[in-house]
């Protein structure tokens, strides 16, 4: 059974993100780029002013391109998307707050992250992690190389 305030709780994340200036920063990761695609480090500001990192890979050629968005797993390390995907699609792999490359000032503990702050809705870590995921979606919606269809 869904709690009465369930929808309000999750809609609150979207409302909170409206007041965040994401200040995107892209920097090519030349060691990861190949003739078929360019890989960037993407930094964005998410909820509570937290800077998050994502791998952002764009195929070479004329776009726009469809996107494969690799949502973060329950672990400390996020890997760059597979080579074959990067050749044909824009690929994004988010490192949410606490994961490696997004671990300053907070480093997530495994196990333990799943229930961190669960006793109060505004301190539950997965509320902020959901915001991190939505921040990347907002970034993608504003990119010319992304096929939004």
Predicted regions located by residue number:
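N-terminal targeting or regulatory segments adjacent to alpha/beta-hydrolase or S9 domains
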Residues: 1-37
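Hydrophobic/aromatic-rich structural module bridging two neighboring secondary-structure elements via a short loop
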Residues: 17, 75-79
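A short loop-to-beta-strand scaffold at the N-terminal edge of the catalytic core in hydrolase folds
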Residues: 38-60
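Glycine-rich His-Gly loop
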Residues: 46, 70-74, 96
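Short beta-strand element of the alpha/beta-hydrolase
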Residues: 54-59, 63-74
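Cap/lid segment of the alpha/beta-hydrolase catalytic domain
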Residues: 79, 83-84, 89-131
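Conserved acidic catalytic loop of the alpha/beta-hydrolase fold
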Residues: 131-148
């Amino acid at each position: 059974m869904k709690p009465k305030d369930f929808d309000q709780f999750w809609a609150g994340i979207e409302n909170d993100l409206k007041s965040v200036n994401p200040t995107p920063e892209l920097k090519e990761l030349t060691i990861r780029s190949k003739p078929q695609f360019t890989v960037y480090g993407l930094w964005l500001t998410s909820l509570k002013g937290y800077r998050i990192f994502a791998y952002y890979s764009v195929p070479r050629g004329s776009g726009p391109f469809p996107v494969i968005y690799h949502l973060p797993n329950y672990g400390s390390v996020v890997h760059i998307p597979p080579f074959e995907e990067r050749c044909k699609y824009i690929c994004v792999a988010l490192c949410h707050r606490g994961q490696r490359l997004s671990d300053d000032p907070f480093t997530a503990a495994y196990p333990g992250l799943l229930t961190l702050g669960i006793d109060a809705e505004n301190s539950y870590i997965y509320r902020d992690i959901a915001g991190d995921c939505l921040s990347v979606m907002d970034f993608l919606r504003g990119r010319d190389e992304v096929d939004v269809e």
